[in-house]
């Protein structure tokens, strides 16, 4: 249940069939300053890893893989595609882009493009469902859905007879701007191929290793 597609003004083109979430760019919700040339970013995932796509105006789409801090967001349905974001939580003079994806806070470079892919780094892990976030009065504000009364499709055998909470719990979380660097371990896992047929000489999509000791 998911797809990345683009519209050329006349028809839709399917770019990739995976769960995708955020589609944005350096301009965020306000739009890119130079929409004809600025990159477009897209985040998604499959069972192997987080997927990060970038669209260049001339080269088209390129894709990269990042490890997952958690598999709790792997559901093959639409609910987990609502939340992760890339937002500028810095200032106009000092932009600071924060990405949330699969339980990890990521430092995301404003300059990320098909020709300049350096700078993505894990910051810390979290155990929340973060809907969106922004900077406010030198604080970070997160809109969180920490637990849901509805279990949706979470009826796996491993869960046993554990029921959902008596009521949903959603609220705003006000915290310091450096909090994304101070939470859980950045331990993560991922792969480029799992049970795939790989041809001789075939090159995988690039996988992020930088940022871990």
Segments (PLM) and residue ranges:
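Blade-level signature of beta-propeller repeat domains, shared across WD40, Kelch, NHL, RCC1
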Residues: 128, 132-198, 204-206
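Extended extracellular/luminal ectodomain segments enriched in beta-structured repeat modules
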Residues: 211-212
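Short secondary-structure capping micro-motifs at structural edges
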Residues: 83-86, 202-207
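Long, leucine/valine-rich, helix-dominated scaffolding and oligomerization segments
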Residues: 1-33, 42-56, 60-69
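Entry beta-strands of beta-propeller and related beta-repeat scaffolds
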Residues: 1, 35-42, 93-98, 138-143, ...
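Repeated scaffold domains used in trafficking and secretory/extracellular systems
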Residues: 16-39, 65-94, 123-137
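Structural motif
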Residues: 2-8, 46-63, 101-111, 148-183
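Ankyrin-repeat and related helical/solenoid repeat scaffolds used for protein-protein interactions
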Residues: 97-146
């Amino acid at each position: 249940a998911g797809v990345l597609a683009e519209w050329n003004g006349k028809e839709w083109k399917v770019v990739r069939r995976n769960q995708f979430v955020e589609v944005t760019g350096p301009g965020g919700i306000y739009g890119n300053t130079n929409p004809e040339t600025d990159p477009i970013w897209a985040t998604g995932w499959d069972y192997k890893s987080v997927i990060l796509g970038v669209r260049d105006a001339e080269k088209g789409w390129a894709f990269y893989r990042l490890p997952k801090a958690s598999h709790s967001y792997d559901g093959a349905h639409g609910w987990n595609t609502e939340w992760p974001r890339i937002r500028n939580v810095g200032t106009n003079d000092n932009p600071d882009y924060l990405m949330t994806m699969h339980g990890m806070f990521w430092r995301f470079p404003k300059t990320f493009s098909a020709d300049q892919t350096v700078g993505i780094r894990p910051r810390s892990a979290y155990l929340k469902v973060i809907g969106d976030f922004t900077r406010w009065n030198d604080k970070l504000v997160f809109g969180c859905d920490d637990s849901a009364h509805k279990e949706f499709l979470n009826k796996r055998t491993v869960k046993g007879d554990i029921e959902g909470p008596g009521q949903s719990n959603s609220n705003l979380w006000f915290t310091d701007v450096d909090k994304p660097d101070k939470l859980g371990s950045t331990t993560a896992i991922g792969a480029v191929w799992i049970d795939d047929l790989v041809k001789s000489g075939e090159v995988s999509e690039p996988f992020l290793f930088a940022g871990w000791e």
